[in-house]
Amino acid sequence: MFDHYIGLLNEKDISLVVTADHGMKAKTNTNGEPNAIFLEDFLKEKFPQDNFKVILPITDPYVVHHGSLGSFAMIYVENQELIPHVLEEIKKIPEIEEVLNKQDACKTYHLPEDRSGDIVCMSSESFTIGSSKSKHDLSSLKEPLRSHGGLHEREVPFIINSSKSDISKQLQIYNYDAFYYATHMANK
């Protein structure tokens, strides 16, 4: 169906760019069961006297495939002196691939400091991050868990209908480049 509609558009005298806002990866074990790390539970076990808030940007009511679990999380730490210790504990979790303090995360990923947590985490390719097991009802999943938000879901299609483009000269193309290529091709 998708190919049919793209074909119809391509027949017109237009510049056409097809891309996506993000990729999607399976987040299950070999039995098809969800792979999730619940960071708030983990931190409360390691630091029972302290308060943490794990924020998952993916959390929304549409839980059909991702169960409100994503590959990206921000952690707010009440006791700021604990941040280096919390960072070290999270780095020990093999399924967490990237753990950065706020300053490094903002610099590396161009995040706004005033809206970022004290710690930023990203899971490995086949795992998701949740806050607390009690906050994620995975029984409503009808399909195997899939999600996005991390380093492994950045790859997206980028299709253009022009051979006049200089796209092959680009080392890195982002989905937000679609507007540039659509307008650039229109002028040729």
Regions found by a protein language model. Give the residues of each.
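Feature captures the catalytic ectodomains and active-site-proximal regions of enzymes
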Residues: 1-188
